[in-house]
Amino acid sequence: MSRILELPLLAATPENIAPFGELVGVDRGRPTSRTRFYDDAVELVEKPRFISDADTCLSVARVRPRALEVIWMERHFKHTQAFLPLNGQPYAVVVAPPGEAELPDLSAVRAFSFDGDCGFLMHLGTWHEFPFALAQPLDLVVILRNETNRNLDAIADGEAVGEDLQKRHIGKRFDVTLRITRRSAGA
């Protein structure tokens, strides 16, 4: 039987999400500027750094609540994937920092909660599981390279692999269950 590793759910803030990526949204600690058009009615938030050197896809996903257990973690080498909520529902993202190893560092895995008013843009190579809906179904825009979609069809030993993707089955690789807990860290 596999061991269980609990991941306390941390509130996503610009500071604690920084090793993994950036928050995307208004009032998230980013500088703003006004455009000289539209009588200053448009305020622009400094944009996060999105990277993609090829055909990029915007998909809309409906994520229904599921068990708060990490099955897969994946990373991308050629683009910075983003998740942008559409319907204001809270969600969680599980991440591990980028690194040279073929697998994520389980001691560095973190779970973050998002209030549904901001998105998340990952750093290049950040390990992650697909977002978890925390209450109602979550509608979100997923921005990624089309090559990644093709890589998801390249299965080797039950995992997806490609030039822009490593998708690893955490339970099989580590004999562990990563479980998100709703109690805060330090509680």
Regions found by a protein language model. Give the residues of each.
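Conserved metal-binding segment of the jelly-roll/cupin
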Residues: 113-127
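A short beta-strand-loop micro-motif that forms or neighbors metal/cofactor-
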Residues: 126-159
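A short pocket-lining beta-strand/turn micro-motif at the edge of beta-sheets
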Residues: 110, 118, 136-139
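His/acidic/aromatic-lined binding-pocket segments of jelly-roll/cupin-type domains
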Residues: 81-84, 119-120, 131
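Non-catalytic, conserved peripheral segments adjacent to functional cores
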Residues: 1-111, 149-187
